[in-house]
């Protein structure tokens, strides 16, 4: 696919997320609170809280903020009670989109998500309409130039499912969600730092968009990610390198 660079797409998305750091902190605090409420305040016995804690650390969130969010969740303090809800839909050219939310008002959230899809050339689908196009897994992406041998050794010893290197030298490691923390710790012990990592919905097949379609799709994704209740947006779209 001419102009399609996986590394450029990763860098582009990471740059957009970094630019929204204030909103990112809000999302992570919500994630920490929900994780602590569901599984307790000890990250060593609460894998979901451990992942949220690591995400907060990577985002340079002060430890005091993290601890307050844990205490608020584990203490069962009165206030908002969030539920997790997933929406599925289609973007430009039938591209698949998954929107994961945490909300205290499902009616408000679905209205906002539906409006975003409709206004920007997409449409909200039924439950299950696109989820089959994605795999729920742990994912680590390493920059070109990273030692493939070192990554491979650490990954497989920690129980990763797959290690793949593309023509640009980008190394991708996939593992079961339950093994994510163990694999991450194995990489840290080996002195490796992934450019991007997380438990994600990984697209099984990609749809490339270029030109005006790419611009419109990027706008839809930006609007969805800007909604207060939205935690994560996944898509099977890759953009032309020039976008």
UniProtKB/Swiss-Prot annotation:
Enumerate the residue ranges of region (Disordered). Answer: 1-21
The set of disulfide-linked cysteines is none
Q: Does the keyword Cytoplasm apply?
A: yes
Q: What cellular component GO annotations does this protein have? A: cytosol
Main subcellular location of this protein, as a coarse class: cytoplasm
Q: Does the keyword Ribosomal protein apply?
A: no
Query: Molecular function (GO) terms listed?
Result: DNA binding
List the keywords (alphabetical). Cytoplasm, DNA-binding, Transcription, Transcription regulation
Subcellular location, record wording? Cytoplasm
A Pfam family this chain is assigned to: TACO1_YebC_N
One GO process term, biological-process aspect: regulation of DNA-templated transcription
Q: Which NCBIfam families match?
A: PRK00110.1, PRK12378.1, YebC/PmpR family DNA-binding transcriptional regulator
Family of the protein in this entry = Belongs to the TACO1 family.
Which HAMAP family has this protein been placed in?
Transcrip_reg_TACO1 (MF_00693)
The name this protein carries in UniProt is Probable transcriptional regulatory protein BP2308
